[in-house]
Structure formats: C-alpha cells, structure tokens
A protein has these predicted regions:
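A cross-kingdom feature marking solvent-exposed beta-strand/loop segments within repeated
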Residues: 80-83
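Hydrophobic adenine-recognition pocket in adenosine-nucleotide-binding enzymes
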Residues: 24, 94
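Short, charged/polar, Gly/Pro-enriched secondary-structure boundary elements
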Residues: 67-71, 137-140
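Core segments of cupin and vicinal oxygen chelate
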Residues: 18-19, 25-70, 110
C-alpha cells in the first residue's frame, strides 16, 4: 500500500473530518511567571488550572477563547523541576497573529521580554514577523495578520 493509499484508508477509518487540534503542551519551571507572561503580556485568559498532588504537577490552560472552539496552550509545571528544561533543537516555535508586529514588539520590549529577532520583513518573503521568548526560552513568532 502506498503512502497516499494508507492516508486515504486511515481518513476513511478514523473519520478525520471530525478531528480538531486541541492544545499544545510546554513544560514551565515557574508557573506564576509563565501565567503572567501569557495572560498579562500576551492577553490570553487563564481557562483552567488544576493541581495534581499525587503526581506533583500542575496543569494550566491559557488561550484567546474557550477550549471548545479554540486551540490553547497547556502549561505543565512539574513541582520538583529546579533546573531549566532542555528545549533541544527539534521544537521550533509557537506562532501568534498580531495586528501590528512593530507596536507589539515595542510594548513587549518595554516590559522586559527578550526579542531575539526584531520586527521586520522575512528575508525571503513579504510577511512582517518577529520572534520573542517566554520565561522558559520558548520562541514565539509574531506574524503580522491582516
């Protein structure tokens, strides 16, 4: 069976037309700092938060709208994690559409956010982008949205 035939069979079997992207999870060392970053600086809402004492971790979900119709970010805080996480080279970034990348970067820089790639056009295309970092060093691409 070819890759195309396999993909078609899986779609027919699984009913992928009803699938939906729910969330992406990132591990954070300081949950309070991460919540402050994502809610106060990026304007997301804390949708839910729950401690799991037997597992010694907390899950907090943040996003721009209700989980029933929006993709959100799951922040996982492992209580015993003292050292920074190794972000490795496989994970790329999260991306946010913003109305004005330049203004957003000015506001975030004034709040002390790291901006490893300042606002400007992409080198090989017309989109205006920037990259910022959250408190754990995860990169977030800001993309100029219409």
């Amino acid at each position: 069976m070819t890759m195309t035939e396999t993909a078609a069979a899986v779609k027919a079997i699984a009913g992928t037309d009803k699938f939906r992207f729910l969330h992406t999870m990132i591990r954070v060392r300081d949950l309070d700092a991460s919540l402050q970053f994502y809610t106060d600086l990026l304007g997301m809402k804390l949708l839910r938060k729950r401690d799991y004492p037997s597992g010694k971790f907390t899950l907090a979900f943040v996003g721009y709208g209700d989980e029933s119709s929006n993709t959100v970010i799951e922040l996982t805080h492992n209580w015993s994690q003292a050292e920074p996480y190794n972000l490795g080279s496989a994970f790329g970034h999260l991306a946010l559409g913003v109305p004005d990348v330049y203004e957003t970067c000015e506001r975030l820089a004034a709040a002390g956010v790291k901006i490893p790639r300042p606002a400007g056009p992409m080198a090989h295309g017309g989109s205006v982008i920037a990259f910022i970092e959250d408190p754990d060093g995860y990169r977030i691409e800001l993309v100029q949205s219409p």
